[in-house]
């Protein structure tokens, strides 16, 4: 069986890294911007494979040094697509998704795996997703998006992640998505022993109350204050589980401790809820940094499950078969792209083969206009639309992303 190597970009503190290593990949390179997260990677991986810096800087990552690597993987920044944010997509200086896709055209990895937040699956980004699929198809890859839930892989947390997997044409027939492994344990089942570790008498009763999986762990960003477990809605969900979400504790509850809501979680407890096993990963930095590293990570069990399926495909295990891939995310985008010219409402209807309500056309053009240049022309009888260039950063030297990155680097996480 061949040795499989991965180049991981925007690697964070290593949730995906650990999962991929468990799946049989070894790291050729892991790149991370945050100093503390990079220190965590060095502590747990071979230190010489970790680089700290902006992954889009050629002096940090030279794609030509990694031609034909088995897997290119990463958890590129999520704010451009976050439901909690402005969903700027290609207009967001932090958007590296399109850049990572274009990296495939240079590095020619045998497989690509990128994960992001659920927001990228929303209708707002249908054109963006379609562009990504079409570009990868042009490069010789079969690509597919899939919304996966961490709780389906034993992680005691409500954590949906939107994952893109692409494989070169000869490997694609051997890939299948991982199947759910069964129900996840509750927060109480997961943390009871840690809550009782220092002798707190209330651990048994607390565990009985914490009888569901956790809400999504939110790592947050450097722009906001100390560590806590999320916005108001999440705090209410934590309170129902008997957890005080207003901060992170330094130690488990002590004998005789009484709580109005319940105890706070420690970083070790949060790591368990994210799918880490005790002692298998050491986090560097102060408490707030460690919490953010853990909270922003891709749960290792999910990364491992996907990684094993990618490994099997690259080894051409089993019988190859044609996959039914959902490759049509935005037919209006495709019609405009294939035309390359101005199209009216009626022309678009003929192109997609169905009626298009005026509100649908208006919304789609508005959404496309946030990720692409869209020209409009008021003709004698009807408005016409023409799709222009993609706005996203794909490595262009003169792109505004470079200036904005330098200006706001300390706030990016």
Swiss-Prot record:
Name of this protein: Type II methyltransferase M.NaeI
GO BP annotations listed: DNA restriction-modification system; methylation; negative regulation of gene expression via chromosomal CpG island methylation
Family: Belongs to the class I-like SAM-binding methyltransferase superfamily. C5-methyltransferase family.
Active site (record annotation): 78
Xref: InterPro entries: C5-Methyltransferase, C5_DNA_meth_AS, C5_MeTfrase, C5_meth_CS, SAM-dependent_MTases_sf
Single GO MF annotation: DNA (cytosine-5-)-methyltransferase activity
Keyword tags: DNA-binding, Methyltransferase, Restriction system, S-adenosyl-L-methionine, Transferase
Domain of life: Bacteria
Organism: Lentzea aerocolonigenes (Lechevalieria aerocolonigenes)
Region forming the signal peptide: none
Gene3D superfamilies the UniProt entry points to: DNA Methylase, subunit A, domain 2, Vaccinia Virus protein VP39
Residues forming coiled coils: none
Ranges of residues in domain SAM-dependent MTase C5-type: 4-317
EC number: 2.1.1.37
